[in-house]
């Protein structure tokens, strides 16, 4: 039996820019690169770029670690200028030390900007993306992908209930 994809999750992933060649040496620079990807994709107004970065950076500094185990980092914040959720996905093949508890460098980044008016959607999205990224085979295929659409397909693929 397969889990039905959340329509919100599906639409968020379908519109997310995906960067396969992150090479920054600081996590703040990765966040800026992914915010710039949102701007370039038309998913974030250029005039909101600096404010989005300031909010993500504040969340990283004040709100604790967004680096998860297994090479995953999900920098995220509530961003009042938005009415919905905007996401950018990035792959850093060398990995970057983001302070994960397991000590592994982060290689898969999912930047999430959410409206404070949509707290349930924010939690649902984080839960849904985490369910997929917890699967070793999905992480492995993302790291091997040569095409953003291959990453998108992996993140949209229904996962089996356990």
Q: Where are the regions a protein language model picked out?
A:
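Cytosolic covalent-transfer regions centered on His/Cys nucleophiles
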Residues: 1-162
């Amino acid at each position: 039996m397969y889990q039905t994809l959340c329509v919100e999750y599906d639409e968020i992933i379908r519109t997310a820019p995906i960067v396969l060649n992150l090479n920054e040496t600081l996590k703040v620079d990765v966040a800026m690169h992914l915010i710039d990807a949102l701007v370039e994709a038309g998913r974030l107004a250029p005039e909101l770029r600096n404010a989005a970065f300031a909010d993500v950076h504040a969340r990283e500094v004040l709100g604790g670690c967004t680096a998860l185990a297994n090479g995953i980092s999900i920098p995220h914040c509530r961003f009042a200028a938005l009415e919905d959720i905007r996401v950018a996905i990035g792959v850093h093949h060398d990995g970057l030390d983001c302070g994960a508890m397991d000590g592994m460098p982060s290689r898969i980044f999912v930047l999430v900007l959410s409206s404070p008016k949509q707290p349930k959607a924010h939690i649902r999205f984080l839960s849904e993306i985490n369910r997929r990224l917890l699967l070793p085979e999905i992480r492995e295929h993302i790291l091997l992908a040569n095409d953003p659409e291959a990453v998108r397909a992996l993140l949209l693929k229904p996962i089996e209930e356990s």
